[in-house]
Amino acid sequence: WCIGVGFMFAPMHHSAMKHAIGPRQQLAMRTIFNVLGPLTNPAGARRQVLGVFSPALCDVMASALRDLGSEHVMVVHGLDGLDEISVSAKTTVCELANGELTHYEIDPATFGHAHDSVADLCVEDADESAALIRAALGGDTSDRSAKARSIIAMNAGAGLYVGGQADSLEAGIELAMSAMHSGKALQTLEAFAELTQAAGGA
């Protein structure tokens, strides 16, 4: 049964890293492990969108990923503090393609996805998160769902672009929006949820 979506829990694949969980929680601050984790992707991904907590890391991480054999990567930092492409501020990007690094900014207004704030996208728990995602993918017309749809489209669009499914970021965003409007995105999410719940109960 092929869904086309996967989730890998890092401590299950990097057994040594699980010993760092306790100290990291005690320190309650960013450490070298926040940088090492994405560089030790157990899937060996050669194409990815990677969010970082500081714009200073964009070039550092993209350079490291190039040295590790990556093909097409976007390392991003939202200037409102998000470690992903933001819809409430510009996003700093270092893109690796064809062995070369390119630096630029993404303005969500360019793609029709600018919003004043992402504060109301914060959730209290997993149930609220799941409900918000389902509402966004399902076409709910509230402002909150529209904002969630925008941030999903921007980041999924970037993934489609670096993954070779779209020729540009703009085309990737359009593909992502099309998948949501058609219901295909929600259908895939529900199939993934069903599969993982069945596996968890096995």
Where are the regions that the model predicts?
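Glycine-rich anion-binding loops and their surrounding alpha/beta cores
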Residues: W1-A202
